[in-house]
Structure formats: C-alpha cells, structure tokens
A protein has these predicted regions:
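TPR/TPR-like alpha-solenoid signature
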Residues: 20, 41, 56, 76-77, ...
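Hydrophobic face of amphipathic alpha-helices that form TPR/SEL1-like repeat modules
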Residues: 21-28, 57-64, 93-99
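Asparagine/serine/threonine-enriched low-complexity, disordered tracts
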Residues: 9-12, 21, 45, 57
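Short helix-capping/linker turns of helical repeat alpha-solenoids
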Residues: 7, 12-15, 28-30, 35, ...
Length: 99
C-alpha cells in the first residue's frame, strides 16, 4: 500500500514513529503480507530509540514468541521500560502478570 511505502521510507531513515507504524502493519497484515519477524525487527528499531509503545509491543513479541524466540526475561525488561515511561497498556500488563 502507499501508506506502507511511506512508512518504510521514513522507517529506513530512522524515524521511530514510522518504524512503530510499519511494525504494526506487519503484525496485522495491513497493506503488507503479515510477517511477525519483520514486525519484531521494526518494533526493536523503534524501541531502542525509546518509543514506549514499541517497547511494549516488543516485549509482547518476546512474551508470545512472535517473530522471535520466546524470552520472558526480555519481555519483562521491555515492558517495564515502557511502563516506566507511563504507557498505560504496559502498566496494566505488568499488574496483570503480577510483576
């Protein structure tokens, strides 16, 4: 899709928001073929730049083993980073998991 094309262009130039949006498209298969490995790749790029929603989603990838081998400790670390930044979904998820 046109949107995916422009997200990719911006993502490749290091735009964290575009990386996050592109990852979501790969996760859901919106305008691109669904690919959890590519979703993980782009979430990781954005998460390393401090994007709190990407950090949460990267943690969920690790928790569920989607696009990457399951790793609960990595999941906890990324979701905790997101929660520290005040991201509601991460805070709720941590409470639900009893972390």
């Amino acid at each position: 899709s046109i949107a995916a094309y422009w997200y990719r262009k911006a993502a490749e130039q290091g735009n964290a928001r575009a990386q996050y949006n592109l990852a979501n498209r790969y996760k859901k298969g919106e305008g691109v073929t669904q690919d959890y490995s590519l979703a993980f790749y782009w979430y990781q790029k954005a998460a390393k730049q401090g994007h709190e929603m990407a950090q949460y989603n990267l943690g969920r990838c690790y928790m569920e083993g989607k696009g990457v081998e399951k790793d609960v400790e990595e999941a906890k670390a990324w979701i905790s980073r997101s929660a520290k930044k005040g991201y509601d979904k991460a805070i709720e998820y941590k409470k639900k998991q009893g972390w």
